[in-house]
């Protein structure tokens, strides 16, 4: 007899689709995965929305013009503006008009040659630069049109402030793109691609010289990329200044054809006490330029009037002497090195300034604000270069500095206005002269130049006391953030000082050399050199500040002091020599090559190294910077700083330096070449180390580290992680438990009885099965399956306490039954291998009582033996009618066709056509033909030899639905009609129909059991005893956007049970509380801000994600629903049937980083619901420690929090009568009796209250703690009271419970407001008004629970008091959470018994209201609210654009400084636009057909 052929032997024969399953080869068991049963358009909708928003963002970035920004700038206060906008708001950036003749003359020269324009300060050198830039840009545009390489102009300055100032000037005078860069923008971290972008989009770049120099060194920019170099204050080009290095290292090394044009600007080419002519020639040589000045000086004089130059003589100064205060400080603290410079200045000031000024320096040098820097200096000094054995602990020195501060605080300074003898003759003369100018209201503006910063500060303070009411002094000194003695100043403060001077708010500026050059300070009519100019440049530049007609430039000169007189005369004569030299220079002169060679004389002993492929250059001086950047790149987040160490030693008349790199560097360092100077030795060592790093591939071809520094976790912008971007991670598909003893033939087995408890009567009988395993399984919770017509049935998994011994025969019987289940029911034939079986199945003995029977007796051995003995049930036509009823029948050749029989239908014969109730198949000739799944020859032979007289059996086809964990889809609800079959083409299974019916549910059951086991494995990794139910809930993610609670769920996975959302909501709150308690206990001296920053680092998603990845929690997350291929046991070889395809990715899943972090919070939430022996939060505390993985939270149970806490001194200090009275009053009101009344005092002390009076900290620390504790109490209440609400609802309604508005009303109702200690008149009136409003609201409304929602917002201090009080009782009670709960139950809970009254309050938020409007009122699901930072906008800060997009159309937009407020604005704008719009009109305008689509889906 010919062997029957399988259908898939004939691939060319087409298959007609039928409703029983998709069209496929007959071997198929119809188990193709439908991974995304949802709307297939959802991903494309999301992509379209993202694309639409990106287009909008790009468009808006261009539309937000300079005019928009100017409007914002105008409306913003000066002290709130950024540096660039602060300068833009002033007239620094005014448009320059009408060049004068001498400016045009110099411009024409600059067009032809490299020149250094020498003109007085204020004579318009910048205009010449603007004219030249416009000319160069015109040429550049022509060159670009001829497809020549792009080139850019660089305007170089010597200070950061000038970057902003000159950029503002150029932006207002040049109609091409101008950008500005300085080191503060972290330009040293930019790579070549970044610079390429800037060069491509800008015509002019204004930057500090160091920025360009570093670029040239790294070859990110080359001389051939530059068409013009402008050197502002060109006299700085000397020695190793970046101006000089740019020219020497790059400009002169390039060929003439590649060199850019050079234009220098200076008031004087001489910046030192040296021969004027020689200095000028050196500058010309160095800048490869010719000095040029106005040929007609009279024209220049007419444009820039010269001031009247005067000498103010003063009597001879006294010798430096020790004042009484100086003596006292010197005798007690003269050995403190941290105060050494102050002592030196004070002594000199006694002569130069007078006794009062000599003492006054201490008044600000030892203030509370200045002490930290002095203390830091003391600590560094103590730990400095001393050997370890001699290191002195700095605490004593710091304490002595504080003692000095106390002396100053109590010192009585004399009144210099009453006692002029306290001032030096020099200061008295200055005072005498200034009084003349400021004796009445005047427009006079004066700058007094001093040599030292302290002098400027002291004179400013002095003249604020002894000046007239019309003299308004101010101070302008150089930027130094590291200065001690109260003299640290930022760029911002410097610019604000200039702004005040420009506005006339200050009219007498005491300034150091910073006011001499560069900064655009308005014209003055009085300039005083309090300290004489030391160089010609100083002289000319400071004099140039006096530009008004009839202005005065005065030198303060000591009477009969030849040195002073000669100094002034020398400067005046030097200026004349310099001018004659400039005018007499021949026009056709060229630079002497010997002069150029002389430039490199100092560099002859310094090597350099150039990378030929890129042109990047390493020099002695640049090697220090390169090495510092390399070390910095080794730093990883919060690890210790990676600093290069340099160690010097002196041997054989030379210095030798050794470099030691940080520990993580693959190369530790090298010893440099001997050198005569310490600095050169250091540079040599750095240079040689860089070469070694380059040799080992640790520096690339641009001398940039091949490592990349991880930015600090502290940076808030980096704490958030993406909730959209997904990565592929390994996913556990089978629990580890199955593998532990696989491969070994067991001698005993454990039992789990599987059964159903239906909610309604089932139509079919289901015979329970027994799951047999090698290892004892844990107790599993009940979970639902949906059988037949979506009848919900609870699956009960009863784990039997004791196992039973099995023989080899028993195992053979059990293995046969289990494999027969896979073969007959699921069309899978496995290789028989008892040792590799994961588990076994057996029918339950229905006559046994589970609770009392022996384990072995629970198995129905009769059915097991029958199946073992009979591979199938034979039949014949002579069998009785009863034989044909209630059988399980299957098609051995086609896995789609399985039936339960009902009995014989005598009205039909095999040769009759199939009734119309049966789905169409390929062969519809007759019933016999319909039931046969063979092809051609085999089919023909079978039909020739079959019994055509056999009965026709009425049967029910079994649906191929496997995922019984969820209700049927619309497609699955299609009712199948009756089927009529012949048995000869089919096989009657030996498995009883009731057992088979239950077995069809087994894939869903075992899938959920395996999910429980995998979830428990994750908990075991963390050593957390979480129950299976909570563990699985915490690890279940059932859609791509699970966290977007009310958005349409993308790729929703059906039948997965509860997802992690609610547990995450609870865990997030507990995490906040736990870390707050730990930080509070461990850091008693930290302020609230420190707490917030540290907590932010602990609870941020980035930190949780990092820990989760370390534990590989991603593998345990359940992100995929029931798998038709994945539920089968592993270990066995599949011989027949479809297995998991080779290309399947079921062991991988895509997870967003935020999802992994959210799961951590969900696990913590799960632990909150577990009972513990001692404290109910013990396991949750342990979970937090495991998942934050930080020393800042390292406790294993609740009780350990209190052990961390070191009681601060103030808490146990002696309690005074007022504090006892306060505690008694509060006990009467609230019922809590404080052990430490100081804590209560602290809780009610406002930050404005002076600490010297309070003697306790203000409430901010306790408020930080109380806020987290109250959050937890509220969240627990709302979580348990509303088990069916999603996290969005919970969050919105929790906001009401912890809102400042509610807590403010609580403070008043409990009478706490009267106990607040504060020092603010305005606050008092605010509290009074608010209390009156609350009392009025109570009278009017009758005091309903939500009366507080109708009042205005309270002063912030009132809710802070409540939270601080909660923190205080928590600490006072020894870290008892119960007292917090008691407070909640007693005073807060009554307001929230009915949360529905707060629905309106929650929905008032514009974003929530917009969602409800679109989703509920309009029935739209294709909408989104997106936000993103607007790129390249130089506004007053970060600019974020938010947009509401409906069906690809932008409905509304909002721009703000943060995403939160931008979304708020966009939502409000969208609501305004949608107001009054009927649904039909909405659908017309936006083309919305969502409701129609939903209707169609519902009717499928």
Curated annotation (Swiss-Prot):
Its cofactor is Mg(2+); Mn(2+). GO terms for cellular component: cytoplasm; nucleus. InterPro entries: Dicer_dimer_sf, Dicer_dimerisation_dom, DSRM_2, Helicase/UvrB_N, Helicase_ATP-bd, Helicase_C-like, P-loop_NTPase, PAZ_dom. Residues 106-287 form the Helicase ATP-binding domain. It holds the Pfam family Dicer_dimer. Residues 1408-1476 form the DRBM domain. Residues 623-713 form the Dicer dsRNA-binding fold domain. The keyword Transmembrane helix does not apply. Keywords: Antiviral defense, Antiviral protein, ATP-binding, Helicase, Hydrolase, Magnesium, Manganese, Metal-binding, Nucleotide-binding, Repeat, RNA-binding, Zinc. The record marks 1356 as: Important for activity. SUPFAM superfamilies: dsRNA-binding domain-like, P-loop containing nucleoside triphosphate hydrolases, RNase III domain-like. Mg(2+) binds at residues 1263, 1360, 1363. ATP binds at residues 119-126. This is Dicer-like protein 1. The lineage of its organism: Eukaryota, Fungi, Dikarya, Ascomycota, Pezizomycotina. The gene is DCL1.
